[in-house]
Regions:
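Phosphate/dinucleotide-binding and metal-coordinating scaffold of catalytic cores
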Residues: 1-331
């Protein structure tokens, strides 16, 4: 979650609603040059849902129906957390088009007409690998961008500084084994229609598992982490404004590497059936769960930071080691 102090996001780049309709973590100024490639201004709509108060904390809407991307009714006023935070100028036709898409999404009919199926499944594969409770699948639901084009929706990543279980603060073994088929950490998948359609369909669930298998087989987590650490280490060491010591940075890197390798092992087991991929299944039989008791999640950061203790709204303590400074930096 950001700690920016602007009260409402300015219109900005290309085509999304509640996530770029950013549902409830209002973004700071977000010029098109800082959006992902291909996300420049267009006739489509972008936004994030939710405003912030002067302390940088959300005013509301973090778990409202529109932030969850539920269909409410046909009145645009019922979707204020979306439309009040659009990142581009939007028309009445834009509003009605999005509402129609949300209605069809909630009904679960002809999903491919209103969702970019491939993009959204791939989004949730990576999202569910990193165990981010500060997100659409967690307690702070508003942390995403939603991209809309011609009535079809997709998700854009946002706010992952408390991923890898550091938001939840739960035990490491539980987090490493987060079930990929029931990833909601707070609430039910039934009220998260942008995710629920995957698991309501055997075809889409199989595709989700296929993409998950391809992801863990195709990514060398240790190599990426080590290469990135080597690249930024000299700057971390010399940073005069650092709020973590260099030793804490190194410890965070070691823990992140270990977490990803253990998470990879758990996901592989969940895909091949040696570990249950659901919360209920893991509760019934935990014998095959991957033991992650050797790592400490807070080494990668926490809600309160590691220096001075305690949560401080609108401060850098609301971030983990190596997180980007508060400002306009985007994923």
């Amino acid at each position: 979650m950001d700690s920016g102090d602007d009260e409402s996001p300015a219109p900005d780049s290309h085509g999304t609603f509640p996530g770029n309709f950013d549902p409830a973590s209002a973004t700071e100024e977000n010029p098109a040059s800082q959006m992902p490639e291909g996300m420049g201004p267009s006739e489509n709509t972008a936004n994030r849902s939710g405003l912030k108060n002067t302390n940088g904390m959300p005013k509301g809407g973090m778990g409202s129906e529109d932030v969850k991307l539920q269909y409410i009714d046909d009145d645009p006023d019922s979707y204020s957390n979306i439309f009040d935070n659009a990142k581009t100028d939007i028309s009445a036709a834009d509003r009605q088009r999005l509402i129609r898409s949300l209605k069809q999404l909630s009904q679960g009919e002809n999903i491919e007409d209103v969702v970019d199926v491939d993009e959204v499944i791939r989004y949730f594969v990576v999202h569910n690998f990193v165990c981010n409770g500060d997100s659409y699948t967690g307690q702070i639901i508003h942390n995403y961008y939603l991209y809309e084009e011609d009535g079809r929706l997709s998700m854009i990543p946002w706010d992952y500084n408390l991923a890898f279980g550091t938001f939840q603060g739960s035990d490491s073994t539980k987090t490493v084994n987060t079930p990929i088929d029931t990833p909601i950490s707070s609430g039910s998948a039934d009220d998260r229609p942008m995710l629920n359609w995957i698991f309501k369909s055997e075809e889409y669930t199989q595709l989700y598992h296929q993409y998950f298998a391809e992801f863990i087989e195709g990514v060398d987590f240790a190599e990426i982490i080590d290469a990135t650490a080597e690249m930024i280490a000299p700057y971390v060491k010399k940073d005069p404004t650092a709020f973590y010591s260099y030793q804490e940075f190194e410890s965070g890197i070691d823990t992140l590497r270990a977490f990803c390798l253990l998470r990879e092992e758990s996901v592989e087991g969940q895909i091949n059936g040696t570990i249950s991929a659901t919360t209920s299944g893991q509760a019934e039989d935990s014998s095959a769960l991957i033991d992650a008791s050797s790592i400490t999640l807070s080494d990668m950061g926490s809600m309160g930071g590691s220096v001075g203790g305690g949560f401080k709204p609108n401060s850098d303590q609301f971030r983990g080691p190596g997180a980007a400074p508060t400002g306009n930096t985007k994923p």
